[in-house]
């Protein structure tokens, strides 16, 4: 299937994961050492933190380069306080971050849309809409085994919030239950299996992390 703006849409409200988010993710995991959370080191926790600190950029900002460039410079100065002061690492260049944002932003701009409006039109046209949650309920930031969770809500109740549509539009919820439990990362794991029994299930079910091929 060819990927085009006709079949792939990116919400204008989606927060952009910048290179410094990945750096901060790695620096913190390295600092924690044996007490680490088992992050994928993709910058997910730092970018969610910035979202709620109002220190993040969103996809829609790409259409306003002048204000976005100025805001990025302020954000980078703020992030460097942590990068240099806490982790003792070299500062990030605002110019480099802007060049990165422009390069990839130009590629992605055609895909950006008002996702809520797009889905509302689809619903009114009688189309079927499927929302798929990633990860299991125990990785949910609110209902999971905190702090060994993802950084967002992954349960079905959050689907209309993230999509920007009224919750009464959701007319069916489908829960998936596995015959055995599995998880990636650090932290407690209820009913964890070990030894030969675990290895057989892992191999038979392909139970490896999609990001790092972790077990």
Task: Give the role of each language-model region.
Residues 1-214:
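Non-transmembrane, aqueous-exposed alpha-helical and coiled segments at domain scale
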């Amino acid at each position: 299937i060819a990927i085009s703006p006709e079949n792939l849409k990116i919400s204008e409200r989606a927060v952009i994961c910048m290179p410094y988010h990945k750096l901060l993710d790695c620096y913190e995991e390295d600092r924690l050492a044996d007490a680490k959370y088992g992050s994928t080191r993709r910058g997910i926790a730092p970018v969610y933190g910035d979202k709620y600190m109002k220190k993040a950029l969103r996809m829609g900002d790409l259409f306003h380069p002048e204000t976005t460039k100025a805001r990025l410079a302020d954000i980078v100065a703020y992030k460097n306080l942590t990068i240099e002061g806490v982790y003792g690492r070299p500062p990030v260049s605002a110019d480099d971050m802007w060049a990165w944002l422009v390069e990839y932003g130009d590629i992605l701009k055609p895909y950006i849309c008002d996702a809520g409006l797009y889905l509302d039109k689809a619903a009114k046209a009688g189309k079927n809409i499927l929302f798929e949650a990633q990860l299991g309920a125990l990785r949910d930031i609110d209902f999971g085994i905190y702090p060994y969770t993802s950084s967002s809500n992954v349960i079905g109740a959050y689907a209309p919030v993230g999509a920007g549509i009224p919750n009464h539009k959701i007319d069916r919820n489908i829960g998936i239950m596995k015959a055995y439990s599995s998880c990636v990362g650090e932290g407690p794991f209820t009913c964890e299996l070990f030894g030969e029994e675990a290895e057989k299930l892992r191999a038979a079910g392909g139970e490896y992390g999609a990001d790092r091929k972790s077990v």
